[in-house]
Amino acid sequence: MSASAAAAPERYVVLGNPVAHSRSPFIHAMFARQTGEPIEYGRVLCPLDGFEACVRQFAASTEAGKGPARGCNVTVPFKLHSAALARQVSARAALAQAANVLRFDEDGWFADNTDGIGLVRDIQTHAGFAIAGARVLLIGAGGAAAGVLGPLIEAHPREVMVANRTRERAAALVRRHRAVGTGLSLRERPLDDCGGPFDLVINSTSSSMQGLATPVDGSVLQAGTLAIDLMYGPAAAPFIEWARAHGAQARDGLGMLVEQAAEAFSLWRGVRPDTLPVLRALREQLAQTGA
């Protein structure tokens, strides 16, 4: 899909509500410069009750001097609705029951979920942590957890424990992943009885963003545990501070954000960008703005 630098830029956006805070335009602009792909990437605020109309309006839109709309990222609260708009849905999006990427193909739309593979690549590439053979605790059983559980399982950990305040929701998520979770221990537990310690602890809840205490006991951690909050920036700070206070290594979800974006870019353009310089630039930007 590569084109000359003089080609009219094909258009992509991130759709959400809210969406003004999104770092996706910065990330994809760096990917475009790095790869020479002629794209333009923006933000679109969709009404809470008008997501489908918003997507269809963008897909059909034209702009003078620019190429057609080719796809979009989808963020909260619309990920659960986006897959229903597609003619074809990837296996990982079907398993997650949510999609964060749409590609506008001539014969219909294609939906995918790149969150989980983005997390796995961040853990293994940027954190240098081997998931294979590890004991993993996934805190939460909502949409964020559903998006990452399948790719986590496919990275061959020894055990995955899903802990959630509402235990039945965790049980439903585990049941849905039984088919891909062969050859490992895949279980659910209440938040106050997780067991442990674990090698990898992932917080998919919004506890940090809400300023709440981490919803599990520090006994789930040990020296050498890698603890990750899927949030980034100040929103992840309470979890990171808690994890470090208990002797764990800790990181936020910024690497996941960049890696899932790279997977989407590859899906759209057929070329995979180098994520490390983009992640470094984004961390520098966040350090300067404090956001």
Language model regions located:
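Rossmann-fold NAD(P)-binding glycine/threonine-rich loop
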Residues: F104, G116, A223-T275, A281
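Glycine-rich adenosine-cofactor-binding loop
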Residues: G16-P18, A111-G116, I123, A127, ...
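Phosphate/diphosphate ligand-binding glycine-rich loop within oxidoreductases
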Residues: A3-A127
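Short, conserved loop/helix-junction motifs that constitute active-site signature segments
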Residues: A5-A8, I131, E154-H156, V216-T225
